[in-house]
Each structure stands twice: as structure tokens, then as C-alpha cells.
């Protein structure tokens, strides 16, 4: 039996309003629990359009047929008008998710984090995280125990900022297995559970055809020698490609693959986790930098 952490990122108003209820129904039918990470502030995702001047981002949008994939309401959100606040307008949906699944913070403003957080000082990072956590906790009526930054835009400064919140774990980077990030003080910080597998939009049209993606992904999962973690998006697998996701779940079950919340991948004690740090890096299929797991030698 292969156990895979299932992380569901919710980036937009439409993803929350339409994608999450559909995913909740499907996961319930298949008796699967997952980790949902919600963006709760303004939906300004349309402001990413300026990135079309960057060849890598333009190519990604073209090969994924972004207009059909996301819809024009997402692609234009927050451009000609103020972005709608996601969390409070969809509080009932988020509370419904919290009844059966692990809930964490993705972002206050997904676009702002992905675009600007790499240049923020630590206090700005702390304030932004605190704002998102406060809103999400008000919605679900209980403390939030985990988070996953937007776009995997994280480095050691983000790691340090998140220590203020005493979360159970974070999922801020790409890597191979859970680890303890080493802090400036020399101590180890809140465990990180990296995403190990490519997302749909990173490989479709570049490495694999849409129709072949599920088989390709299942093969990657079965060959994974670390701790497999897979990310889906409410805007993709909860909307335009929902039936493909249903097919993935059915095929995974036949292969002996089970999905679980990310917290179930943590060992009984943190001491069992290796030390590491988050450094800025790049991966194929994704424009710009993102946080990547890097091992830390015990001799350091």
C-alpha cells in the first residue's frame, strides 16, 4: 500500500465557490481525507496577466489552455475592479470543508504573496500571515495548525517568520520528504512537508498529453522513494478537470494507492526527521523561483 499526502490549494473566489464543494462531494464518495489550504483575502489573481511578457509564463498559459482551464473570471479577477474577498463570502463552504478535512492557510492575498513576498522584510511577512490566519480562524471557529505559502514562494526568511505562529507543520517548498528546517539560532523549526510530485499544469503539454496524465502520475507515485505529496487545485481538478481527477482516484485505488492529510505523514517524534533548509530554486514547468528542500549536514 502506497500512502500519498493530498494537498488541495484553493487560490480564488471561483475555486472556493465552485471547486471546493465538488471536491468535498467526490472525496466523501471515495472515503478520502485531505489537507485544504485556503486563500481568504482579495482575489487579485488576474493581476498575474502582466507576467505574459515573460516567455516561460506565456508558454505555460498557452500549453495549458488557460482560458478554458481557469475561466475568464479568474484570469481577470482584480484587474479592472477590486478583487472580491474570498473567505468571508464563502465562509459556509470553508466551514463545511473543516468538518471532515484538515484546514490550513494558503494566503491572505495569493497574488501579493506570489509577486512580492520575496522582497518583504520579516515583519511584513509576519503581519501578512497573521492577517490570513486571523480571518481563517474566525471562519472555522478553531485554531489553524498548518499552512502552505502561495506558489511555493518561500525561503529561510519565511521559515523564520512562521515560527511566530507555533503551527504543527508547514508545506512551503518542493522536495522529497518531511524535514526540520534549521533556524538561525541553530535550533530546528516547525516541520516542513514538501510537495514531491509535479502539478497538472507543470507537465501537461510539456511532458505528457492531457489524456495520459493520470497514468503518468500514478507511475511517478509508485516510483517515488521519498514521502509522496501531491497538490491539486480547486480551480483545476475541482472545475474543468474534475472528471479526470475522479478517474485518478479510481485508478489509484486499483493500484493500492491511498491518499491522506499531510499531517498523517509526520512521524511520532520530530527527532526522527532530518535537518534541512529552504533555498530558492527552479523546477521545469513553473515560471520564477520557488522554495526547494536542501539537506543540512550534521557537521554544519
Curated annotation (Swiss-Prot):
EC number: 3.5.1.n3
Alphabetized Gene3D superfamilies for the sequence: Glycoside hydrolase/deacetylase
Occurrences of domain NodB homology (ranges): 2-260
Keyword Hydrolase: yes
Pathway the protein acts in: Glycolipid biosynthesis; 4-amino-4-deoxy-alpha-L-arabinose undecaprenyl phosphate biosynthesis; 4-amino-4-deoxy-alpha-L-arabinose undecaprenyl phosphate from UDP-4-deoxy-4-formamido-beta-L-arabinose and undecaprenyl phosphate: step 2/2; Bacterial outer membrane biogenesis; lipopolysaccharide biosynthesis
SUPFAM superfamilies: Glycoside hydrolase/deacetylase
Gene Ontology MF, one: hydrolase activity, acting on carbon-nitrogen (but not peptide) bonds, in linear amides
GO terms under biological process: 4-amino-4-deoxy-alpha-L-arabinopyranosyl undecaprenyl phosphate biosynthetic process; lipid A biosynthetic process; lipopolysaccharide biosynthetic process; response to antibiotic
Cross-referenced InterPro entries: ArnD (IPR023557), Glyco_hydro/deAcase_b/a-brl (IPR011330), NODB_dom (IPR002509), Polysacc_deacetylase_ArnD (IPR050248)
GO cellular component: membrane
Record keywords: Antibiotic resistance, Hydrolase, Lipid A biosynthesis, Lipid biosynthesis, Lipid metabolism, Lipopolysaccharide biosynthesis
Catalytic activity: 4-deoxy-4-formamido-alpha-L-arabinopyranosyl di-trans,octa-cis-undecaprenyl phosphate + H2O = 4-amino-4-deoxy-alpha-L-arabinopyranosyl di-trans,octa-cis-undecaprenyl phosphate + formate
Domain of life of the organism encoding this protein: Bacteria
Pfam family, one: Polysacc_deac_1
Stated role: Catalyzes the deformylation of 4-deoxy-4-formamido-L-arabinose-phosphoundecaprenol to 4-amino-4-deoxy-L-arabinose-phosphoundecaprenol. The modified arabinose is attached to lipid A and is required for resistance to polymyxin and cationic antimicrobial peptides.
Family indicated by similarity: Belongs to the polysaccharide deacetylase family. ArnD deformylase subfamily.
Protein's name in the database: Probable 4-deoxy-4-formamido-L-arabinose-phosphoundecaprenol deformylase ArnD
Amino acid at each position: 500500500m502506497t500512502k500519498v499526502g493530498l494537498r488541495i490549494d484553493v487560490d480564488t473566489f471561483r475555486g472556493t465557490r465552485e471547486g471546493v464543494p465538488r471536491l468535498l462531494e467526490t472525496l466523501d464518495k471515495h472515503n478520502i481525507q485531505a489537507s485544504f489550504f485556503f486563500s481568504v483575502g482579495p482575489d487579485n489573481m488576474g493581476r498575474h496577466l502582466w507576467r505574459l511578457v515573460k516567455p516561460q509564463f506565456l508558454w505555460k498559459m498557452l500549453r495549458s489552455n488557460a482560458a478554458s482551464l481557469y475561466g475568464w473570471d479568474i484570469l481577470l479577477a482584480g484587474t479592472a475592479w477590486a478583487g472580491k474577498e474570498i473567505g468571508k463570502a464563502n465562509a459556509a463552504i470553508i466551514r463545511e470543508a473543516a468538518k471532515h478535512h484538515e484546514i490550513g492557510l494558503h494566503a491572505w492575498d495569493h497574488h501579493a504573496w506570489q509577486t512580492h513576498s520575496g522582497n518583504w522584510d520579516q515583519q511584513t511577512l509576519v503581519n501578512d500571515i497573521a492577517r490570513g490566519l486571523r480571518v481563517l480562524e474566525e471562519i472555522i471557529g478553531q485554531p489553524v495548525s498548518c499552512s502552505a505559502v502561495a506558489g511555493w514562494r518561500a525561503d529561510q526568511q519565511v521559515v523564520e517568520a512562521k515560527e511566530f505562529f507555533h503551527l504543527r507543520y508547514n508545506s512551503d517548498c518542493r522536495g522529497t520528504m518531511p524535514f526540520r528546517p534549521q533556524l538561525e539560532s541553530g535550533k530546528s523549526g516547525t516541520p516542513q512537508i514538501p510537495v514531491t510530485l509535479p502539478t497538472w499544469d507543470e507537465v501537461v503539454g510539456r511532458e505528457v498529453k492531457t489524456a495520459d496524465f493520470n497514468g503518468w502520475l500514478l507511475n511517478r507515485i509508485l516510483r517515488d522513494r521519498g514521502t509522496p505529496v501531491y497538490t491539486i487545485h480547486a480551480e483545476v481538478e475541482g472545475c474543468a478537470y474534475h472528471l479526470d481527477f475522479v478517474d485518478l482516484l479510481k485508478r489509484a485505488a486499483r493500484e493500492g494507492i491511498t491518499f491522506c492529510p499531510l499531517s498523517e505523514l509526520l512521524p511520532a517524534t520530530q527527532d526522527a526527521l532530518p535537518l534541512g533548509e529552504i533555498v530558492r530554486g527552479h523546477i521545469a514547468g513553473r515560471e520564477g523561483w520557488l522554495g526547494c528542500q536542501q539537506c543540512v549536514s550534521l557537521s554544519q
